[in-house]
Amino acid sequence: MPSISVHAYAKINLGLFITGKRDDGYHNLETIFAPVSWHDTLCFSPADAISMRCTNADLPTDGSNLCIRAARSLQEYAGVGDGVSIELDKQVPFGAGLGGGSSDAATVLRVLNGFWNINATVEDLHPLAVKLGADVPYFLEMEGLAYAGGIGDELTDLHAGLPWHVVTVFPAEHISTAWAYGNFHRRFGQSRPDIRTIAADLSGIGDTGRLELFENDFQSAVFEQFPKVRRVHTDLLEAGAVFASLSGSGSAVYGLFETAMDARRAIERQRASYPTNLTPPGFSMRQ
């Protein structure tokens, strides 16, 4: 079989409400996932064993890497003896709240499912995805906007995309998920907006009036600890964003812009200092 190259796209979170802590140590949450065009590229080639190379020397390529773990979990699930050589061109920043590692893992599951002629259904692969990470099912199963509950693995496809230009900025701070969950300002039990319904409405009409309802429970703690992240958030609003927010647990921040001109101007203000991405309205991961 010839080599295959595939993009693995990142995501942002439109709102993120942490609703409680579970007995297993995980937290329940509600969020809206939205894809962005920032992506890694994975190349898969036939091989006798599972191996990996990466353009970013800071990322391990041993058994701790999510790509290797995904390949091995699928190999064990299907009982196949085939190997694969994976080359990862890493462009999505890690420790950014953009789900880059989760997207890579989901791409490995999806591609190797066909590469190894396993042909399992998405429902079959879902348990493997959950074990790899709470965000992995989104990248495996969805294309555009999706509501997520549970630990992020209970998904509802909203069959839509964001109607705005999305500027995403990585302020060069790597924030661990463990730190974020240990420091966010808890407000369990408080009333929350129905973000599933609101997001479905917003995607169709581009109404900016209710965007402020999409709060991120990590944001205030991250802004207190990492002033550079707060500064980028302020800069995006000053550049004309109708809404700006932390993505996930950070440190990436995004702004939603109504015009391409405003979005490009915002990008120009940031790209001299930080990695940036511009995603067009209605973007889908399966384009």
Curated annotation (Swiss-Prot):
Q: Tell me yes or no: is rRNA-binding among this UniProt entry's keywords.
A: no
Which residues bind ATP per the record?
A: P93, F94, G95, A96, G97, L98, G99, G100, G101, S102, S103
This protein's record includes keyword Cytoplasm: no
Q: Which residues form the active site?
A: K11, D135
Catalysed conversion reaction: 4-CDP-2-C-methyl-D-erythritol + ATP = 4-CDP-2-C-methyl-D-erythritol 2-phosphate + ADP + H(+)
Q: Alphabetically, which GO biological process terms does the record hold?
A: isopentenyl diphosphate biosynthetic process, methylerythritol 4-phosphate pathway; terpenoid biosynthetic process
Identify the metabolic or biological route this protein is part of: Isoprenoid biosynthesis; isopentenyl diphosphate biosynthesis via DXP pathway; isopentenyl diphosphate from 1-deoxy-D-xylulose 5-phosphate: step 3/6
Spans traversing the lipid bilayer: none
Q: List the disulfide bonds.
A: none
Q: Name one GO molecular function term.
A: 4-(cytidine 5'-diphospho)-2-C-methyl-D-erythritol kinase activity
Q: Which UniProt keywords apply?
A: ATP-binding, Isoprene biosynthesis, Kinase, Nucleotide-binding, Transferase
User: What EC number(s) is this enzyme filed under?
Assistant: 2.7.1.148
Q: Which InterPro entries match?
A: GHMP_kinase_C_dom (IPR013750), GHMP_kinase_C_sf (IPR036554), GHMP_kinase_N_dom (IPR006204), IspE (IPR004424), Ribosomal_Su5_D2-typ_SF (IPR020568), Ribsml_uS5_D2-typ_fold_subgr (IPR014721)
Q: Which family does it belong to?
A: Belongs to the GHMP kinase family. IspE subfamily.
Q: List the PANTHER family hit by this protein, alphabetically.
A: 4-DIPHOSPHOCYTIDYL-2-C-METHYL-D-ERYTHRITOL KINASE, CHLOROPLASTIC (PTHR43527:SF2)
| Record NCBIfam families | ispE
Explain the purpose of this protein: Catalyzes the phosphorylation of the position 2 hydroxy group of 4-diphosphocytidyl-2C-methyl-D-erythritol.
What is this protein identified as? 4-diphosphocytidyl-2-C-methyl-D-erythritol kinase
Report the source organism.
Answer: Chlorobium luteolum (strain DSM 273 / BCRC 81028 / 2530) (Pelodictyon luteolum)
In the UniProt record, the gene name given for this protein reads: ispE
